[in-house]
Amino acid sequence: MTYNIVALPGDGIGPEILNGSLSLLEIISNKYNFNYQIEHHEFGGASIDTFGEPLTEKTLNACKRADAILLGAIGGPKWTDPNNRPEQGLLKLRKSLNLFANIRPTTVVKGASSLSPLKEERVEGTDLVIVRELTSGIYFGEPRHFNNHEALDSLTYTREEIERIVHVAFKLAASRRGKLTSVDKENVLASSKLWRKVVNEVSQLYPEVTVNHLLVDACSMHLITNPKQFDVIVCENLFGDILSDEASVIPGSLGLSPSASFSNDGPRLYEPIHGSAPDIAGKNVANPFGMILSLAMCLRESLNQPDAADELEQHIYNMIEHGQTTADLGGKLNTTDIFEILSQKLNH
């Protein structure tokens, strides 16, 4: 079997971190004996510059045919038209591929707890995943309107939309430490009342998973005061957007965090959580670990290569533990150095 991968380098530092990661993929495929082919497509601001829109039909169709999609980063101050922004291409891609589940791991690597803005003893051993519903909720709700006197947004969830994201979270929790925290605002929101009801019903199908409920404001506090207590957190779109960004600073750098977006049966999208960082683009100083860890997620989830994913992650964790990092993590290496060291480790 030959896996079909679509590469979307995007904007800013996206091309350099993605292209370097693809060089690692070539080494890994030879080592673990699997085949793949890459289709490169412009996306985001780069696509606006070339084609006048952030996501062309050609690119979208290629993504629909793919086994996996790897995205570098998009956006930047260059693209200011509110009706034609790079981010609109990503929203359209998620919706078109029905990428309803966003998976965001947060791991504090051994030896790197000093990088966290929190006390070391508070974050050591943190290993959690936030499962965020991605295609419904207040970001997509209708009706919505805005004028100088009034603005309206609509927060709507159906039972089916809640059930499918909750099943993803339960299955993930069952494969990890067996603990699921469901986040809502059940004390004031009707949508959260339905959310909690559905979570309790679905929990009957997963007796091996312990479930607890937290209001979103309480969860935001516990993420700071005791992040180690969490295993898997599941939440609706807006809450997940906020909480996953909060959790991402716990390890000390946005550059350490990967993410994946899943549908039930279509291609999955893998990308680092950081932005395009146009101020450092082309300077060979970008931290590529988030992109490489996203590649590891792709190896495990879409390319059926769990051993390769484990090896790649362990090499990264060992590098971080021994201070072999870029400047944002306190090290002295540049982007190329990171890829060269990992290439040597993988070839060993």
Curated annotation (Swiss-Prot):
Keyword annotations of the record: Amino-acid biosynthesis, Branched-chain amino acid biosynthesis, Cytoplasm, Leucine biosynthesis, Magnesium, Manganese, Metal-binding, NAD, Oxidoreductase
Record-listed substrate binding positions: 94, 104, 132, 217
Cellular component terms (Gene Ontology): cytosol
Gene3D superfamilies cross-referenced by the UniProt entry: Isopropylmalate Dehydrogenase
Site (Important for catalysis): 139, 185
Cofactor remark from the record: Binds 1 Mg(2+) or Mn(2+) ion per subunit.
Top-rank lineage group of the source organism: Bacteria
Subunit structure: Homodimer.
Assigned protein family: Belongs to the isocitrate and isopropylmalate dehydrogenases family. LeuB type 1 subfamily.
Record-given protein name: 3-isopropylmalate dehydrogenase
Source species: Staphylococcus aureus (strain Mu50 / ATCC 700699)
